[in-house]
């Protein structure tokens, strides 16, 4: 397919050109076609990878494990309870050891500096499965899903509703800037992206023709929107008093049928999951009992409606992650 990114780490999309990002998505589309047609593609059967998880995961872990096995690779999983990294062994030492045993390393955890240091010291490709700052593999799936709907994404408007300073919103702003899209962050003024990242993305947008917009007005965010996107409002383990504050702050930015109606009739809804769209979880029921909310960031009718694409998006995590691993490990296409 033309581009060569063999040996590179995948830490943030700020490190990749628009052509490289589209190349990875094109490759993911091809992997999806192969898998759907039952065509074997064990092109990396001589490779071994390790997955380092300091945070729990469903989609990211499954996508890496299934994708790696589809490519013929061996997979080792280490969580915080089965690794000495940062406890009895320094991060640098762990990285050097893993780099001698494995061909690639995935990391899902907290600090962006950890995944960057793994790449610095290991000597092998390192893939960011999520940090507090960025979630780049999610972005490839998000754009792939939108491309399956609209084709070329240049000029298309994607609006993130809610906490626009979180890792998903950060990464959406980056990928939209890279691909010449119209990105809108719609949320409370105190939860807008950090200035340093806005400045980086504005510099990218000046080259690609992207538009970056920031508003606390839901109608402005939804107007002419092609992709309406949201994420959960709170994380597990946070104190109840923080829940109350965040729910009060973010409740006006819930994606519901009224918000969807303000967007283009052809608009789609995306969500990185998990979602609190009903009371069918312990957390959902707890929120209902404490605050009387049947749903949080998105209502059940939108989540289950004809414009929703979050499960297609979740499947595409596997295809896009497979593309990242294959391209950086040097599979022959």
Tell me what each language-model feature is.
Residues 1-62, 66, 134:
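Positively charged, low-complexity intrinsically disordered leader regions
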Residues 48-101:
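Active-site cofactor/substrate anionic-group-binding motifs, chiefly glycine-
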Residues 53-66, 148-231, 236-238:
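Glycine-rich phosphate/diphosphate-binding loop of Rossmann-like nucleotide-binding domains
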Residues 71, 101, 121-122, 179, ...:
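Short, structured coil segments at secondary-structure junctions
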Residues 95-96, 103-175, 271:
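Anion-binding alpha/beta catalytic cores of soluble intermediary-metabolism enzymes, centered on
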Residues 202-299:
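Rossmann-like adenosine-cofactor binding region
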Residues 286-333:
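C-terminal helix-to-coil terminal segments
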């Amino acid at each position: 397919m033309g581009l060569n990114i063999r040996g590179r780490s995948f830490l943030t999309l700020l490190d990749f050109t628009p052509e490289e990002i589209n190349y990875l998505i094109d490759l993911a589309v091809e992997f999806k076609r192969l898998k759907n047609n039952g065509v074997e593609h064990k092109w990396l059967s001589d490779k071994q990878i390790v997955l380092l998880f300091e945070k729990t995961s469903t989609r990211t872990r499954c996508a890496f494990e299934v994708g790696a096995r589809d490519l013929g690779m061996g997979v080792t999983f280490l969580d915080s309870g089965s690794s000495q990294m940062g406890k009895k062994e320094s991060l640098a030492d762990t990285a050097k050891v893993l780099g001698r045993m494995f061909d690639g390393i995935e990391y899902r955890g907290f600090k962006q500096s950890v995944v960057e240091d793994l790449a610095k010291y290991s000597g092998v490709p390192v893939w960011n499965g999520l940090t507090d700052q960025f979630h780049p593999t999610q972005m490839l799936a998000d754009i792939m899903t939108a491309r399956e709907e609209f084709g070329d994404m240049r000029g298309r408007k994607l609006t993130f509703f809610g906490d626009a300073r979180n890792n998903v919103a950060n990464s959406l702003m980056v990928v939209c800037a890279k691909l010449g899209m119209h990105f809108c962050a719609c949320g409370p003024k105190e939860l807008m992206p950090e200035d340093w990242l806005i400045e980086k993305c504005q510099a990218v947008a000046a080259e690609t023709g992207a538009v970056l917009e920031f508003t606390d007005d839901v109608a402005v965010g939804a107007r002419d929107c092609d992709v309406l996107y949201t994420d959960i409002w709170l994380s597990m383990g946070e104190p109840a008093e923080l829940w109350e504050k965040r729910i009060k702050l973010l409740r006006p930015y819930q994606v519901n049928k009224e918000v969807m109606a303000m967007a283009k009739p052809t608009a789609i809804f995306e969500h990185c999951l998990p979602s609190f769209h009903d009371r069918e979880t312990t957390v959902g029921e707890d929120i209902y009992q404490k605050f009387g909310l049947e749903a949080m960031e998105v209502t059940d009718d939108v989540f289950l409606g004809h414009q929703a694409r979050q499960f297609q998006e979740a499947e595409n995590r596997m295809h896009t992650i497979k593309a990242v691993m294959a391209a950086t490990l040097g599979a022959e296409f």
